[in-house]
Amino acid sequence: MKHFIAAAVAALSLNLAFAVELEGAKFDDTAKVGGADLVVNGLGVRSKFGKRYVAALYLPTKSSDAESIVASKGPKRVALHLLKDGDGKTFSKAFVGGIEENSSEAELAGIKDRVAVFFSMMQSMGDVKAGSVVVIDWVPEKGTYVSVNNKALGKEIAGEDFFKALLKVWLGKDPVQGDLKTGLLGKS
């Protein structure tokens, strides 16, 4: 009987170790990006006009320092689990606005063409239902990849400078939402 109970506890522990959840949105606690293993750094809820999405930040190693995360080399992932229906037009405007708020004029000048490509890419996703998952991966030496429900949106967008500008939407000095940033940093 002791062995059965120990096995049951171990099995339950394994199930808990393979997923993290917030607001009913479940994420794997690890991800593979560009051949590298990443771990969930933190989760947060975007709640402008109601709860819109849960975001998960994946990194090679956990960190609670936003500036060092943005500056760090290596693959990264931001996954957004939608809690409400959304559309590409709204997403694209919000992302571009966040990039503009957190980038200098010189940074924006260097990435403006890629921001335009990203804007078009996000608009092309059209309407998305609650429960959909938008994944944004940074793969070093390759680029930024975006997918919705495991379907790629366009081709990769080159340049680490672009991904860093995008990451600052959530982790910059003027993030889209302060408590969302806190959650992604694993501080909530």
Label every model-predicted segment:
Residues 148-151:
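Short strand-turn-strand beta-turns centered on an Asx-Gly dipeptide
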Residues 20-70:
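N-terminal structural module
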Residues 29-31, 143-146:
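Short polybasic amphipathic segments
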Residues 178-188:
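Cysteine/selenocysteine-centered motifs that mediate thiol-based redox chemistry or coordinate metal-sulfur cofactors
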Residues 15-19:
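Sec/Tat signal peptide C-region and signal peptidase I cleavage site
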Residues 63, 68-141:
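Mid-length scaffold segments of soluble, non-membrane domains
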Residues 155-180:
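Flexible glycine-rich active-site/ligand-binding loops centered on an Asp-His dyad
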Residues 4-13:
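Sec-dependent N-terminal signal peptides
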